[in-house]
């Protein structure tokens, strides 16, 4: 079942977490391409310095100011498309970036990372930007809540955003091999599980014998 518009018409951070485990589907020329979402990032409101909406409703970001449940697809580095879903109430610019997914069906490429994911599902700005996710070509299917724990951390590559870069608005399924970067908190978790290093053996004074 497709997610209804009401699913997206909530706080961006709530939607970013709730999308984990759901299935992104693109019907491309009659071919079904699908992947299970394992990593997202929330971009919340006009004050978020990491968001495209910080500059107002520019031609690129205008979709973020529109109704929830639309696809916001843009190009980075001139070659890679990124797929977002518009969230929250209309007029409050916010969206969730789908960073990575687990391939299920018809994927053409690795689905690890937002550019790879769009290539794998053949999602393109010129065809899919602004699409209503309640339609028949590009949508998100409901799925049971994931069994994996959800971990959070700072968003990727937004160092320019000052204090906003530290907001823990990246969400990922712990242990998924399809996450684009090590899952937030993974290094700390590994360190916590690692056995403590043995204490250094004290040196004996020279000539003290065995």
From Swiss-Prot:
Residues 181-210 are annotated as: Disordered. Residues 181-196 have a biased composition (Low complexity). The keyword DNA repair applies. Coiled coil: none annotated. Its EC number is 3.2.2.-. Keywords: DNA damage, DNA repair, Hydrolase. CDD domains: AAG (cd00540). InterPro entries: Formyl_transferase-like_C_sf (IPR011034), MPG (IPR003180), MPG_sf (IPR036995). GO terms for molecular function: alkylbase DNA N-glycosylase activity; DNA binding. Residues 201-210 have a biased composition (Basic residues). It holds the Pfam family Pur_DNA_glyco. GO terms for biological process: base-excision repair. NCBIfam families: 3mg (TIGR00567). Belongs to the DNA glycosylase MPG family. This is Putative 3-methyladenine DNA glycosylase.
């Amino acid at each position: 079942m497709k997610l209804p518009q009401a699913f997206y018409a909530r706080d961006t951070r709530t939607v970013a977490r709730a999308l984990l485990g759901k299935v992104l589907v693109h019907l491309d020329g009659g071919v079904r391409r699908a992947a299970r979402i394992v990593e997202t990032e929330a971009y919340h409101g006009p004050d978020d310095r990491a968001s495209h909406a910080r500059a107002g409703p520019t031609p690129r970001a205008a979709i973020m100011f529109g109704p929830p449940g639309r696809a916001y697809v843009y190009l980075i580095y001139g070659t890679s498309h990124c797929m977002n879903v518009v969230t929250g109430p209309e007029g409050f610019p916010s969206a969730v970036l789908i960073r990575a997914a687990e391939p299920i069906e018809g994927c053409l490429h690795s689905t690890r990372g937002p550019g790879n994911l769009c290539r794998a599902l053949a999602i393109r700005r010129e065809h899919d930007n602004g699409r209503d996710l309640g339609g028949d070509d590009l949508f998100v299917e409901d799925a049971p809540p994931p069994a994996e724990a959800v971990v959070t951390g700072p968003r990727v590559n937004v160092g320019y955003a000052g204090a906003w870069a530290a907001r823990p608005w990246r969400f990922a399924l712990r242990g998924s091999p399809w996450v684009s970067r090590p899952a937030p908190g993974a290094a700390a978790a590994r360190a916590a599980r690692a056995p403590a290093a043995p204490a250094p053996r004290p040196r004996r004074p020279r000539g003290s014998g065995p």
